[in-house]
Swiss-Prot record:
Source organism (scientific name): Coxiella burnetii (strain RSA 331 / Henzerling II)
Positions with a binding annotation for substrate: 15-17, 41, 136, 219, 251, 263
Name by which UniProt lists this protein: Dihydroorotase
Reaction equation(s) it catalyzes: (S)-dihydroorotate + H2O = N-carbamoyl-L-aspartate + H(+)
Underlying gene: pyrC
Keywords, sorted A to Z: Hydrolase, Metal-binding, Pyrimidine biosynthesis, Zinc
Residues binding Zn(2+) 2: 99, 136, 174
Length: 348
C-alpha cells in the first residue's frame, strides 16, 4: 500500500508546555491532529478551572489560522482539590478529564497524590458526573525496581480502584508492559489505554545497549522486547480499548543531553508517520484509523472529526533539531529517514 486516507486523528495524551515553547508544540501537534488532550503538569500545575481556561486561551493563541485544532483540557488532581472544582470542570465546556499523578512519578508531579485513598471522595464525584480519570500508572516507592513500577501499580492501586469505582471511566495512559495490556483486555469496558509511538518502536535494549541514548529516555521507561511485542499486538488488533496517545513531551536539547537528563520524548513532528510505520510493519494499516481516529473519540463520547488526512509512502528526513523557545529541541528520529508522511488535509 502506497497511500492511506484516514479520518483526521486525535492525540489523547500530549504535553504542550507553556510560554515561549507554545509556538513550537502547538504547531507540531496541530499539523496532524484535530484535537489533543493537554496534560496539566505545568509549574504551577493546572488545578482549577480558571487556570485551565487561561491555559486554553494561551494555547489557542498559537493555533495556525489554517487549522481547526482544539485543545482538550485536564485538571491536575491533588489531595486538596475541592469537590466543587470537579463539578465545575465537568460543566466548563473545555475540560474533558482529571489527571492522577502519583507524587514524584514523572516530570512536575511533585504536587501529585501521595495516597490514592485520600482522593476517593473526589473519584466518587467524578464517577457521579461522568468525568474521566487519566492515570500515570506507576508506583513511586524507591524500593520497587523502575522496570516493575507499572506492574506493581496495577496490583496495589489500579485493581482496587477499578473495583471500587466500576462506573468511573479510566484511561491507563502510556502503557508499557504486557502485564498492562493483559489487565486492560480483562478489565471492564470503562477502562481504556493509550499507547505511545516510542513504546511501540523501542525496548530497553534500544535505550541502554551499547550506549545510553538520552532521547529514548521516558517514563514509563522502555521495557523488554516481549512487552514491546504485546503493545504492538494490542495497538494493531482493532480492539477499541487501545487508542493513540503520543505522550509527546519536549525538553530542550541541553536538558536531554545532560549528566542528569530529563525524561520525555518529543515525537510530535513525526507522530502519525511513526504510527503508520509500525502498523505497516504488521500489515495492519487497515487498523490505523480505528486506533488513531475512532476509538479515543468513542471512549470520550465525542464526535468523529469531519476532515481527513492522506498519508503517502514517500521517504523524508526528520529535522536534526527544531527551535524551542530560545533553545533547541531534538525530535525523535532526528536526522533519520521515515517512509510515511502526510500528503494532504482534506475537509468535507
Amino acid at each position: 500500500m502506497k497511500k492511506i486516507t484516514l479520518i483526521r486523528p486525535d492525540d489523547w495524551h500530549c504535553h504542550l508546555r507553556d510560554g515561549s515553547y507554545l509556538p513550537r508544540t502547538v504547531a507540531d501537534i496541530a499539523a496532524q491532529f484535530n484535537r489533543a488532550i493537554v496534560m496539566p503538569n505545568l509549574v504551577p500545575p493546572i488545578t482549577t478551572v480558571q487556570q485551565a481556561k487561561a491555559y486554553y486561551d494561551r494555547i489557542k493563541a498559537h493555533v495556525p489560522k489554517s487549522s481547526n485544532f482544539e485543545p482538550l483540557m485536564t485538571l491536575y488532581l491533588t489531595e486538596s482539590t475541592p469537590q466543587q472544582e470537579i463539578k465545575a470542570a465537568q460543566q466548563s465546556g473545555i475540560i474533558v478529564a482529571c489527571k492522577l499523578y502519583p507524587a514524584g512519578a514523572t516530570t512536575h508531579s511533585q504536587a501529585g497524590v501521595k495516597d490514592l485513598k485520600a482522593i476517593y471522595t473526589l473519584l466518587e464525584t467524578m464517577q457521579s458526573v461522568d468525568l474521566p480519570l487519566l492515570i500515570h500508572g506507576e508506583v513511586v516507592d524507591y524500593a520497587v525496581d523502575i522496570f516493575d513500577r507499572e506492574a506493581v501499580f496495577i496490583e496495589r492501586e489500579l485493581l482496587p480502584l477499578v473495583e471500587t469505582f466500576p462506573q468511573l471511566r479510566i484511561v491507563f495512559e502510556h502503557i508499557s508492559t504486557k502485564i498492562a495490556v493483559d489487565f486492560v483486555l480483562e478489565a471492564p469496558s470503562k477502562l481504556g489505554a493509550t499507547i505511545t509511538p516510542h513504546h511501540l518502536l523501542f525496548n530497553r535494549n534500544d535505550l541502554l545497549s551499547g550506549s545510553i541514548r538520552p532521547h529514548y529516555y521516558c517514563l514509563p521507561i522502555l521495557k523488554t522486547s516481549e512487552d514491546q511485542m504485546a503493545l504492538i499486538q494490542a495497538a494493531t488488533s482493532g480492539n477499541p480499548k487501545f487508542f493513540l496517545g503520543t505522550d509527546s513531551a519536549p525538553h530542550s536539547q541541553t536538558k536531554k543531553q545532560s549528566i542528569c537528563g530529563s525524561a520525555g520524548i518529543y515525537n510530535a513532528p513525526a507522530a502519525i508517520a511513526l504510527y503508520a510505520e509500525i502498523f505497516a510493519s504488521q500489515n495492519a494499516l487497515d487498523k490505523l484509523e480505528g486506533f488513531a481516529s475512532r476509538f479515543g473519540a468513542e471512549f470520550y463520547g465525542l464526535p468523529l472529526n469531519n476532515s481527513q488526512i492522506t498519508l503517502i509512502h514517500q521517504p523524508w528526513q526528520v529535522a536534526e533539531s527544531l527551535p524551542f523557545g530560545n533553545e533547541l529541541v531534538v525530535p525523535l528520529f532526528a536526522g533519520q529517514t521515515l517512509q510515511w508522511q502526510i500528503k494532504s488535509h482534506e475537509h468535507k
